[in-house]
Amino acid sequence: MTRALPAPAPTAACPCGAGAYGRCCGPFHAGDAVPATAEQLMRSRYSAYVLHDTAYLRRTWHPSTCPTDLERGEADAPATRWLGLDVKRHTQQDPTHATVEFVARYKVGGRAHRLHETSRFVRLDAGGAESPQGRWLYVDGDLT
């Protein structure tokens, strides 16, 4: 499954809550732009979860930690209703490493849940080497 839901209209609110979809996460999902910061990448990945865009999630996941069964995990996604995102902190340790702490609220089967995570990101060039000119990728995260 690449995308189970259609992309929002460009003027519609972005699922990440940071603006209009066409000026926020939409260009990243379409491949027209790349996130300049780890926070932008994290927000675009949250929106991709909302839209069930597994192709984008895979494209922005570090190859050493990306699950091989990502699509299978998305089979339960329609039962998940994402409610909102709150970015608590974005810290850039150096030009190629950053963390983003966030809380994502969602419902499954009518029950409310919170996902509180500190995610780790690395910036890699096309050859897979760490580079300040590379693109940000999600590595992993610690749940709180």
Swiss-Prot record:
Name under which the protein is recorded: UPF0225 protein RSc0270
Transmembrane segments: none
Organism expressing this protein natively: Ralstonia nicotianae (strain ATCC BAA-1114 / GMI1000)
Family: Belongs to the UPF0225 family.
